[in-house]
């Protein structure tokens, strides 16, 4: 039997919103402005959700957990990621891995990278790597207006039992 992998890219971005708690890569960042959104606006977790759902042909974050579904209002990115992974598995796929990059000036991901990877990997039930980059002052994240998350996910059809 030939295993055919499926790969997809997911993107998410949110503007900073003063007064909201900051959740990025499954972690709370005290003292940082949070991000505006229907849920906790965790760009890393949301990008990973988009990548996983797309790889399994299950749509995207908005189609699965959007504003038309009030039960997901205020949900944590980790909860959305865990539910996305469950849906991917229910659709007959095994998750190989996910890689997420957070683009922006703050918070500084590096010092908490291992913690973020542990939290997101537990939510997915597969390895999740986390990295970060700045844009040297260019664009939305470079102007410190918010953050962008980009993720890639690898899934493959689960072997028949």
From Swiss-Prot:
Keywords: Isoprene biosynthesis, Lyase, Metal-binding. Pfam families: YgbB. InterPro entries: MECDP_synthase (IPR003526), MECDP_synthase_CS (IPR020555), MECDP_synthase_sf (IPR036571). SUPFAM superfamilies: IpsF-like. Gene3D superfamilies: 2-C-methyl-D-erythritol 2,4-cyclodiphosphate synthase. A divalent metal cation binds at residues 12, 14, 46. Involved in the biosynthesis of isopentenyl diphosphate (IPP) and dimethylallyl diphosphate (DMAPP), two major building blocks of isoprenoid compounds. Catalyzes the conversion of 4-diphosphocytidyl-2-C-methyl-D-erythritol 2-phosphate (CDP-ME2P) to 2-C-methyl-D-erythritol 2,4-cyclodiphosphate (ME-CPP) with a corresponding release of cytidine 5-monophosphate (CMP). Homotrimer. This is 2-C-methyl-D-erythritol 2,4-cyclodiphosphate synthase. It comes from Salinispora tropica (strain ATCC BAA-916 / DSM 44818 / JCM 13857 / NBRC 105044 / CNB-440). The gene is ispF.
